[in-house]
Amino acid sequence: MLLSDRDILAAQADGHISLDPWTPEMVQPASIDVRLDRFFRLFNNHAYTYVDPAENQGELTEQFEVKPDEPWILHPGEFALGSTWEYVKLDASIAARLEGKSSLGRLGILTHSTAGFIDPGFEGHITLELSNVSTLPVKLWPGMKIGQMCFFQLSSPAEHPYGSATTGSHYQGQRGPTPSRSYVNFYKADITD
C-alpha cells in the first residue's frame, strides 16, 4: 500500500519513518521531497582503465564538497554521486522508492540510474546517481529539492530487514555519497551447462 500524505505524517509520528532534518512542509500528496547535500563523488578517470564490479577499486571516485551557497555544475554526459541532505531511517514494516523531480527531469537531470528502491530497515543518507542527459551544464544547489520518496507499507514486517546479519547490507548507516561496494560478497553464477 502506497502511503498518502496523512499516512506519511502518522508513520513519522509513530517512528516507522524518520528523516533528519524533518520538515513537514516537504510532504506531498503521496511522497516527501528530499534535498541535495553538498558532497559529491566523481569518477577518477585516470586511476583505472576499466571498472570491474568484482574488484575493490578504492580510488575509482573522489569526493568533493561545495560550499552551502555555491552550486555544483553537472556537465552534459557527466555522472556523479550525490546524496540526500536528509538521513533516512525506515523500520522493518516500511519500504520506499526514490524518484526524481519532474521539473529537474525536464532539464535533463536524472537522480538515479537503477537504485531507486530502499529496503525496510535501511538507515543512512540516500546516495544519488546523478546524470545530466541534456546538452547544457546544469547547476545543482545544495539544499535544493532533488527527488521525492514514496513509502510502502509491507503486508508484514520483513523477517530480515536491511541491516540484519543475514542480508549483507553494504550501505547501512552510510553518510554522504557512498561509492560502490559491489566487490563485497560479489556473486557470479556458474552459467556453463
Curated annotation (Swiss-Prot):
Catalytic activity: dCTP + 2 H2O = dUMP + NH4(+) + diphosphate
EC number: 3.5.4.30
Keyword Cytoplasm: no
This protein's record includes keyword Hydrolase: yes
GO BP annotations, alphabetical order: dUMP biosynthetic process; dUTP biosynthetic process; nucleobase-containing small molecule interconversion
SUPFAM superfamilies in UniProt: dUTPase-like
Alphabetical list of Gene3D superfamilies matching this protein: 2.70.40.10
Positions with a binding annotation for dCTP: 101-106, 119, 127-129, 148, 162, 174
Enzyme class: hydrolase
InterPro entries: dCTP_deaminase, dUTPase-like_sf, dUTPase_trimeric
HAMAP family: dCTP_deaminase (MF_00146)
Complex and partners: Homotrimer.
Protein name as annotated: dCTP deaminase, dUMP-forming
Lineage start: Bacteria, Bacillati, Actinomycetota, Actinomycetes, Bifidobacteriales
